Swiss-Prot record:
Family label: Belongs to the UPF0301 (AlgH) family.
InterPro entries in the cross-refs: AlgH-like (IPR003774)
Source species: Rhodococcus opacus (strain B4)
Gene Ontology CC terms: cytosol
Domain of life: Bacteria
Gene3D superfamilies on file: VC0467-like
Pfam annotation, one family: DUF179
Protein name (Swiss-Prot/TrEMBL): UPF0301 protein ROP_34500
Amino acid sequence: MAHAEEPEDRTASTEPVVRPGSLLVSSTDLVEPAFRRTVIYVIEHNEAGSLGVVINRPSETAVHDVLPQWAPLTARPSALYVGGPVKRDAALCLATLRTGAQADGVRGLRRVHGRVVMVDLDSDPEVVAPLVEGVRIFAGYSGWTYGQLDSELQRDDWIVISALASDVLAPARVDVWAQVLRRQPLPLALLATHPIDVERN
């Protein structure tokens, strides 16, 4: 069965539910350089902990230089993205399925949520290519032990928003942090106007 784009969750809850397919949008008070104005796509969230990748931090390393076989499938910019501070020497890959494409039973693809799938980088790109709109490859990931993310949510470090499949492949020229906030209802949407450099404002 094909998975269409899920309807967007346009509600902000004081007790947000994190699940695979959620976005963790850093709050304006989170000034730690590694996560300031970041958007994290949640891949796993269970009793063992949580795992996700930052989807708006392209690096200067070209995919062609490290995984040339995947470069033709990589959405622009064809750069390796910095997925987070954990295991920066390891690569994770997400892809967005084409509308109507079937991933069930395809070796190397694992559904995360809706049209977003994880791709095993040891699989055959020629098998994957007809099924996906593009892939995004990340160096490292962001991880939390059990209860750690809940503590950060209680501190209001993160805003939980449901992702659209298109968020995963957003081009570098798009301010993803502002874009996902702007599409939320007021007053949350107003945060999108928060200046990048507060000291300049």
